Amino acid sequence: MKPSIYSLTRDELIEWAVERGQKQFRATQIWDWLYKKRVQSFEEMTNISKDFVSILNDSFCVNPLKQRVVQESADGTVKYLFELPDGMLIETVLMRQHYGHSVCVTTQVGCNIGCTFCASGLIKKQRDLNSGEITAQIMLVQKYFDDRKQGERVSHVVVMGIGEPFDNYKNVMCFLRVINDDNGLAIGARHITVSTSGLAHKIRDFANEGVQVNLAVSLHAPNNDLRSSIMRVNRSFPLEKLFSAIEYYIEKTNRRVTFEYIMLNEVNDSIKQAQELADLTKTIRKLSYVNLIPYNPVSEHDQYSRSPKERVLAFYDVLKKNGVNCVVRQEHGTDIDAACGQLRSKTMKKDREKVTATK
């Protein structure tokens, strides 16, 4: 199976081309065709010799993904189900915001983190995506915009889809460098957010990268007992380790950390728990932000339900009174399979039923 050329950073592409007897500018031309003209085949690169196009075709594919399902919401949210070269399925979401167009990308096939409320973890991790497969998600959404010919572009990226990004650290970092490259898609680092469930050692590594990319942490509970019961990762990285790493990140980068907090009815949404959360984040209040997220129910996790609006607002009020920077997240795509992993899970179930029916 040939790798996608999207797996290479610009420097790596230059090195690869020079090793094959090409001038550096040839790699720059190829990069422009990929990320500025956004061609889908090497044959479309009209200023590249046929001999070198043949070498490119022997070495790489361009976009490795195949579109399986597209769902479009009344609010303009678009959910894509893509098939990988090995037949596995991943999800990508386009969200139209007042500030631009944001894309949520997947980094793994399945997830091993084991959050008990999440659709993504219904199927255990089968493999990491390579950086080309992650970048290809952005390129296909941008192609959707290009085909519409309305001058739209992907302006923001959130690495919050299926999988734990920091469990696929090397490929995620390569992806970030490709989409941030000023000579390509040029998506600003401060318009990119990577979300982790709390791999403390990788948060420290991320702090040392020197990138201006935003960091979000999936917190979802204000104490170790509750967090360990709903997020298995907390047993390896309890709040003490997690917050030590977060404090290191803030000290090293002077950048704000966003805490994601899904509101689960009568699980983590009490007034007492709101006060615990305010106390937990007290020492980093100036450089932290809490995002309260309405829960998208998942049929396989029917022990959980969405917090009623009045409980969310009461929780929010406690945080605000304690000086916590916080917001209730705007919902997108509520009329489609909005929860991360739902569309993939449903499609895989249908595929299995078709196979069974033909036997």
Curated annotation (Swiss-Prot):
Provide the binding site for [4Fe-4S] cluster: 111, 115, 118
* Compartments where found: Cytoplasm
| Residues involved in S-adenosyl-L-methionine binding | 163-164, 195, 218-220, 296
The GO molecular function terms of this record are: 4 iron, 4 sulfur cluster binding; metal ion binding; rRNA (adenine(2503)-C2-)-methyltransferase activity; rRNA binding; tRNA (adenine(37)-C2)-methyltransferase activity; tRNA binding
Named cofactor requirement(s): [4Fe-4S] cluster
Q: Which InterPro entries match?
A: Aldolase_TIM, Methyltransferase_A, RlmN_N, RNA_MTrfase_RlmN, rRNA_lsu_MTrfase_RlmN/Cfr, rSAM
Cystine connections: 104-340
**GO annotation, biological process:** rRNA base methylation; tRNA methylation
In the record's cofactor note, how is the cofactor described as bound? Binds 1 [4Fe-4S] cluster. The cluster is coordinated with 3 cysteines and an exchangeable S-adenosyl-L-methionine.
Look up keyword Iron and say if it applies.
yes
Enumerate the catalysed reactions.
adenosine(2503) in 23S rRNA + 2 reduced [2Fe-2S]-[ferredoxin] + 2 S-adenosyl-L-methionine = 2-methyladenosine(2503) in 23S rRNA + 5'-deoxyadenosine + L-methionine + 2 oxidized [2Fe-2S]-[ferredoxin] + S-adenosyl-L-homocysteine; adenosine(37) in tRNA + 2 reduced [2Fe-2S]-[ferredoxin] + 2 S-adenosyl-L-methionine = 2-methyladenosine(37) in tRNA + 5'-deoxyadenosine + L-methionine + 2 oxidized [2Fe-2S]-[ferredoxin] + S-adenosyl-L-homocysteine
Where is this protein primarily located? cytoplasm
Enumerate the UniProt keywords alphabetically. Answer: 4Fe-4S, Cytoplasm, Disulfide bond, Iron, Iron-sulfur, Metal-binding, Methyltransferase, rRNA processing, S-adenosyl-L-methionine, Transferase, tRNA processing
Which residues are in the Radical SAM core domain?
97-329
Pfam families referenced in this protein's UniProt entry, alphabetically = Radical_SAM, RlmN_N
- In terms of domain of life, where is this protein from? Bacteria
Cellular component (GO) terms are: cytoplasm
Q: What does UniProt list as catalytic?
A: 91, 340
What EC number(s) has UniProt assigned to this enzyme?
2.1.1.192
Q: Which family does it belong to?
A: Belongs to the radical SAM superfamily. RlmN family.
The miscellaneous comment for this protein is: Reaction proceeds by a ping-pong mechanism involving intermediate methylation of a conserved cysteine residue.
Q: Which NCBIfam families match?
A: rRNA_mod_RlmN
Its annotated function is as follows:
Specifically methylates position 2 of adenine 2503 in 23S rRNA and position 2 of adenine 37 in tRNAs.
Q: Mind telling me what this protein is named? A: Probable dual-specificity RNA methyltransferase RlmN
